Regions:
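Acidic, surface-exposed loops and disordered segments
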Residues: 1-119
Length: 119
C-alpha cells in the first residue's frame, strides 16, 4: 500500500472486533510514534496502552461513548506542557500540535497493520 492508499484507508471507526491486539503490532505502532516529529524534537508526550477490560470500563466513566467499551486496546495520549517548545514571540505552547502529529502517526501505523482507530 502506498502512502496515498494508506491515508485513504484510514478513518475513525467505532466498531471493533473482540480480539486482542498483538504485541508485535503495538510495538510497531509505538516505534512509529517514537519517530514522529515534534518541535525541537522535544517529544513532549507520554502514551499509555490499556488492554484490560476493567481499566477500559473505568475510562468509559470519563469518556462516555458506548463504542469505547468494545475497543480491545486504547492508547491514551498525554501532552506535557512543561516539556514542550514555547515560541519566544508569544510563548505559544506547541504540545497540542506535537501530540496531534504523534497521534496521527498512531492512526496511520495502526491502519497499515490492519487495525481500526478513532481519533
Amino acid at each position: 500500500m502506498n502512502f496515498l492508499e494508506l491515508v485513504k484507508a484510514r478513518y475513525s471507526s467505532r466498531n471493533y472486533e473482540d480480539r486482542p491486539v498483538e504485541a508485535e503490532k503495538l510495538d510497531y505502532i509505538m516505534e512509529c510514534v517514537r519517530l514522529a516529529p515534534s518541535a525541537v524534537n522535544l517529544q513532549p508526550w507520554r502514551f499509555r496502552i490499556v488492554t484490560d477490560k476493567e481499566t477500559i470500563a473505568q475510562l468509559q466513566t470519563c469518556y462516555k461513548r458506548d463504542w469505547l467499551s468494545t475497543a480491545p486496546c486504547i492508547i491514551i495520549a498525554c501532552a506535557n506542557h512543561e516539556e514542550s517548545w514555547h515560541r519566544r514571540a508569544d510563548n505559544k505552547d506547541h504540545a497540542d500540535i506535537d501530540v496531534a502529529i504523534a497521534v496521527e502517526h498512531i492512526c496511520l501505523a495502526a491502519t497499515e497493520q490492519g487495525l481500526a482507530t478513532c481519533w
